[in-house]
Amino acid sequence: MKKHLTTFLVILWLYFYRGNGKNQVEQSPQSLIILEGKNCTLQCNYTVSPFSNLRWYKQDTGRGPVSLTIMTFSENTKSNGRYTATLDADTKQSSLHITASQLSDSASYICVVS
């Protein structure tokens, strides 16, 4: 009898909140558990104005954040390997889509708007 091992990925979702009056950045969900090989999408909503750029970072435990994408107001989609970021500047929303997740994707993901 064969044993099948299913690997679960735990994508820690860092809730980032920047609150100074009207400027806020919120991410959801706060954490996500998915099966290896599956796709997932992380969301970022912001009220930052004026808007210069939006960045997605990946931070492995015990390490500093690594930039995945930098998007400006005029960019709608940007890809970096299995990571695809979308930006809708009108609704002030961004998403990070991870395709064919791997164990190495287990990390914190941070959305930064400036």
UniProtKB/Swiss-Prot annotation:
CDD domains: IgV_TCR_alpha (cd04983). Its main location: membrane. GO terms for cellular component: T cell receptor complex. InterPro entries: Ig-like_dom, Ig-like_dom_sf, Ig-like_fold, Ig_V-set, TCR_alpha_variable. Residues 1-21 form the signal peptide. Disulfide bonds join C44-C111. The keyword Lipoprotein does not apply. Keywords: Adaptive immunity, Cell membrane, Disulfide bond, Glycoprotein, Immunity, Immunoglobulin domain, Membrane, Receptor, Signal, T cell receptor. Residues 23-114 form the Ig-like domain. The keyword Disulfide bond applies. Glycans are attached at N39, N45. It is found in: Cell membrane. GO terms for biological process: adaptive immune response; response to bacterium. Alpha-beta TR is a heterodimer composed of an alpha and beta chain; disulfide-linked. The alpha-beta TR is associated with the transmembrane signaling CD3 coreceptor proteins to form the TR-CD3 (TcR or TCR). The assembly of alpha-beta TR heterodimers with CD3 occurs in the endoplasmic reticulum where a single alpha-beta TR heterodimer associates with one CD3D-CD3E heterodimer, one CD3G-CD3E heterodimer and one CD247 homodimer forming a stable octameric structure. CD3D-CD3E and CD3G-CD3E heterodimers preferentially associate with TR alpha and TR beta chains, respectively. V region of the variable domain of T cell receptor (TR) alpha chain that participates in the antigen recognition. Alpha-beta T cell receptors are antigen specific receptors which are essential to the immune response and are present on the cell surface of T lymphocytes. Recognize peptide-major histocompatibility (MH) (pMH) complexes that are displayed by antigen presenting cells (APC), a prerequisite for efficient T cell adaptive immunity against pathogens. This is T cell receptor alpha variable 10. It comes from Homo sapiens.
